[in-house]
A protein has these predicted regions:
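Helix-loop-helix module between adjacent transmembrane segments
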Residues: 50-51, 96, 126-154, 163-235, ...
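Flexible loop linkers connecting adjacent transmembrane helices
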Residues: 57-86, 107-110, 116-120, 134-180, ...
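N-terminal alpha-helical transmembrane segments of multi-pass membrane transport
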Residues: 1-102, 112-119, 461-485
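Transmembrane helix-loop junctions in multi-pass membrane proteins
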Residues: 53-58, 104-108, 197-210, 232-245, ...
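Alpha-helical membrane segments and immediately flanking helix-loop junctions
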Residues: 77-113, 140-143, 150-166, 170, ...
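Extracellular loop-to-transmembrane helix junctions
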Residues: 32-68, 113-153, 341-347, 448-461
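Extracellular/periplasmic helix-exit of transmembrane alpha-helices
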Residues: 137-149, 262-278, 286, 292, ...
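Membrane-interface loop-to-helix entry segments
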Residues: 42, 46, 50-66, 186, ...
Length: 485
């Protein structure tokens, strides 16, 4: 048995290294090399391709994104969370819950620590091209969604548009269909990869929360883990409670964090030009190229952007498909601006808090300690408590969001039944509890493997299906032109 477990661990570590390690190394001036992982080699070209296909949609249609965000939907499209019906803004909140997590805090700190201030610029660029990928996959999820007999409303995501691709189903053709009797192997592999990934993330979330509360309030991990699981269980084991809770806490937590950052910026306005000068000069600086540091600057920013906004991984489309909307493109625009909110706004909040802190105070620190010291500098003892609470909210909302994603994939694999839905929720709660007591690296690696495989299966089908989303985009723009005269 021991040798079998060792073999499984070896396979997981090998796959993690292959998917996220350096597959291609490009020599650079200064003796350094630019290492490119398979994930970067897949996601960056995909983002550039879809940005060109949509004629630079993130820039060209930014006004349209804001418009769909603030417009009041028709009475039929407003959503009824008690019946499982979500409006466009509610699906954006669910997807934002999973995008906005520990990565917006510690991940950004790690990017700047490893690549300097210039990493922030490349994080922004990655978000811009990632918005186009997010638009395509969310629009496809709407085009191929199904009615959900369990929760009410709709369900869908990559498992369903992958299924339709291999069974040659047209958009909307199977709207009334339940779970098909014949499954697509690729779609099933995507769904399974997602469930593996989200279970692994649950364990990491538990560890993050217990560590933060132990540091801030001296609460023992066992106590914080029990409380976290009990609160989560009350929500996730109730029908349609997840979206209702996220509808409340996500705007609050994001608003609080943004407000704190605005306060930091306003109290350090004279230093702001220097921060921007650092970001742009270190992104393109000759010193970085000559010293061999350009690769670190570029890749830390790119990876941070990719990991944070999830564009291309196929996660967010599981929420986008649940929306009741009068046009599929609107959900694509919602998810495109979701990438903007996550990376350009919230990841930048962490970057500014860190870059407006004297370098000498955080020079020898790592990870969460850097951010806690930065917050302590700006807000005193309150800053440490605030970060612990915000991390709890970010992590907890991520857990609720991934369980929302999981339900459509569980249904695809195991059919429409409450037994499989409840079993996966209990499994995720167990992982959450175990993670609060100890972090097992192999489980985190398993999550990395899961999201890597999700991305491969998703992008594999997105390329041939993207013409459907682009056709829908053209039809949407023509309709808008006629309405606007």
């Amino acid at each position: 048995m021991h040798s079998v477990l060792n073999g499984i661990v070896f396979v997981i570590e090998f796959m993690t290294g292959f998917l996220w390690g350096d597959l291609l190394k490009i020599p650079l001036p200064g003796g350094s090399t630019l290492g490119l992982s398979p994930m970067v080699l897949l996601l960056i070209p995909a983002g550039i391709y879809y940005t060109l296909c949509t004629k630079f949609l993130p820039i060209r249609m930014f006004r349209e994104m804001i418009s769909v965000l603030i417009e009041k939907p028709d009475a039929k499209m407003q959503g009824d969370l008690s019946k499982g019906k979500l409006s466009g803004i509610q699906t954006l909140i669910v997807s934002t819950a999973t995008r906005v997590g520990m990565g917006n805090l510690v991940g950004v700190v790690a990017a700047i620590s490893g690549g300097g201030a210039g990493a922030v610029f490349w994080m922004w660029i990655t978000a811009l091209i990632g918005s186009s990928t997010a638009f395509i996959e969310a629009t496809l999820a709407q085009l191929h969604k199904r009615k959900d007999p369990l929760y009410g409303g709709f369900r869908g995501g990559p498992a369903y548009y992958i299924h339709d691709f291999f069974f040659h189903n047209k958009p909307g053709e199977k709207l009334e269909e339940g779970i098909p009797k014949k499954r697509s192997i690729v779609a099933a592999l995507f769904a399974l990869s997602g469930l593996i990934c989200w279970a692994g993330i649950s364990q990491v979330i538990g560890n993050s929360v217990s560590s933060a509360f132990e540091n801030a309030f001296s609460v023992k991990p066992l106590i914080s883990s029990i409380l976290l699981v009990l609160i989560a269980a009350v929500i996730v084991l109730r029908k349609n409670a997840t979206a209702r809770v996220l509808d409340v806490i996500v705007p609050v937590m994001a608003g609080l964090y943004f407000a704190m950052t605005v306060f930091v910026i306003l109290t350090h306005l004279p230093a702001l030009p220097h921060v921007f000068e650092r970001i742009f000069s270190e992104a393109f600086g000759l010193r970085q190229i000559v010293s061999g540091g350009f690769a670190a600057v570029l890749m830390n920013g790119v990876k941070r952007g990719l990991f944070s906004n999830e564009a291309g991984s196929g996660s967010a489309p599981c929420a986008a498909a649940a929306a009741d909307t009068d046009h599929p493109v609107k959900m694509g625009l919602f998810q495109a601006i979701g990438v903007f909110i996550d990376t350009i706004i919230l990841c930048s909040c962490t970057a500014f808090i860190m870059l407006l802190t004297p370098e000498g105070m955080i020079k020898d620190l790592q990870g969460m300690d850097i951010l806690q010291m930065a917050m302590n500098y700006h807000f005193g003892a309150f800053g440490k408590i605030f970060i612990a609470v915000i991390l709890w909210l970010f992590s907890f909302s991520t857990f609720l969001g991934i369980l929302f994603y999981a339900r459509s994939n569980v249904s695809y694999l195991f059919g429409d039944n409450w037994a499989s839905q409840t079993a996966y929720k209990i499994f995720a709660l167990v992982m959450l509890f175990v993670g609060g007591l100890a972090q097992y690296t192999v489980v985190w690696d398993l999550g990395d493997v899961g999201i890597g495989l999700m991305t491969i299966f998703n992008l594999l089908v997105m390329y041939p299906l993207s013409k459907e989303a682009l056709s829908s985009l053209r039809e949407f723009e023509e309709k808008r032109k006629k309405l606007n005269g």
